[in-house]
């Protein structure tokens, strides 16, 4: 049978046989042998890049491409009568056919090849026009590079040879710069290309559980930022465009990307496209502060060194938080609990007012994966989670290999704090009370149907909820912080926006998280709750941040303490470096101090102050911290000048600078949350 006209036109457009995708390698190129579960076309893959060789791969890409054999394309007639008209007509037809093929690939209806070969097809040298049309169909691209990468991963089955994916990312970078010319990246599409490349490496490192021959811990936020910055600095346009002058903005942006990607891995598109949006929520990502605002999600830098954002520690074992050991012991034994704040006259009239900054009580839902299991009254509540491998995969594209599930979210959702972003998340009914500096959680038994609605705090009511609960907990809100999930979600464009809006409009529920920092007794913990409305989620957030801000002292010690260690910016270094032998200087690793307020959950040594005084302290502290952040920014150029004589010294000092910068920004964000909550509460107080 003869091929259809459309098929002929498509073949003329991409000019390459389907079996030719893997024929571009020379025998000398390294190959990564796929597993038996991989498609036949994927069994021999180009050795994938890693964080270590990322710069070399990007720099040598053009030379490598020159060595590849040229795939013949269909000749274009240019001789005879009407040559220009013929060429013009054929060019127009080619553009139309390229657009047609790109549209079908985006829709998953291009049948000439398997949908699993789409990325290889687009990245082929001879199909640049189709690739360009495909990327244009993704426009307008989001202002976040990570969200742009998410959109791409949802639009195409992103398993392909390394050089083909690299070409796709390069084209995507150019289109992103065209859409967003006024960012701190200026016209530097090569720099954006490096960031996209680095994000793929990070995704593989954080979420790929394939076995490797050696065991290493996963990249920390600081390591990811420093590796990416190193690659950027080696890119000529980075210097030519003077992008480095706004490097602190890039650090903030990369830190946001790390936190989001750590929580939500890149999705894997399927042929049916039914799992592209995975509960419509993959089109929703956290808001990124790409313009350098200090308003970005908080995360204690010390907890960044652990990949655990929930109850799970780095090795994957269940690690139940012990920060509230004393509260829990007293709570379970019906003993009085120590006061965490200085009670004032106005507190009596507000402490039982449900829905206020002083008191929140309701039956809501908690994400099952984040629910603590300690102090369970039934053995079935004490089952440990399966052990997860922490081996690091050195393959950049390891995440692209087929898994047993339709999306990579399935195996990693247990470690994310945002169950809102996963349609398969399981939720448990809980009774929640937030009062007097603590949050009380009662996990309701599944067989309990009729529950007495009561917000009383007397012992009889508490005993009733203990009886109908399989487990219950009490947590101090010292240094805790709450966020409404919907406040940190941005909606994509087009159909994705419609899907998300329709779904959220229908259910009208709200979600909020409560983060407890790492302390001497355990790692960072994030609990996620779901309420009947976003308004109620905001009320819980205000109440939690009010009490956290009221009982948490400002961390002046972290910034006022003088250390004998040299981090690279002591007064002596900054003023006398010309007369010093810098090679004899011992540069120590900068780490934030673990304050006394985090050593004990019910610390009696923590000074209790009046509400007005705490508010004043927070106002002064945030103002002073802003000054310290500005001063820290001011010394960066000087540090670059002083330490550029040696790569090792330079890297150590810049690592320290980045670590301290991130820590200060995180503290700034948290204290602003406290300040806002206290100011709102003060409006209802009569002095």
UniProtKB/Swiss-Prot annotation:
Q: Key word Cytoplasm present in the record? A: yes
Compartments (UniProt record): Cytoplasm; Cell membrane; Bud neck; Bud tip
Q: Where do Low complexity bias regions lie?
A: 73-83
Q: Which domain of life is it from?
A: Eukaryota
Q: Name one GO biological process term.
A: regulation of ARF protein signal transduction
GO MF terms listed in the record are: guanyl-nucleotide exchange factor activity
Entry keywords, A to Z = Cell membrane, Cytoplasm, Guanine-nucleotide releasing factor, Membrane, Phosphoprotein
**What protein name applies here?**
Guanine-nucleotide exchange factor YEL1
Q: Which organism is it from?
A: Saccharomyces cerevisiae (strain JAY291)
Q: Which gene encodes it?
A: YEL1
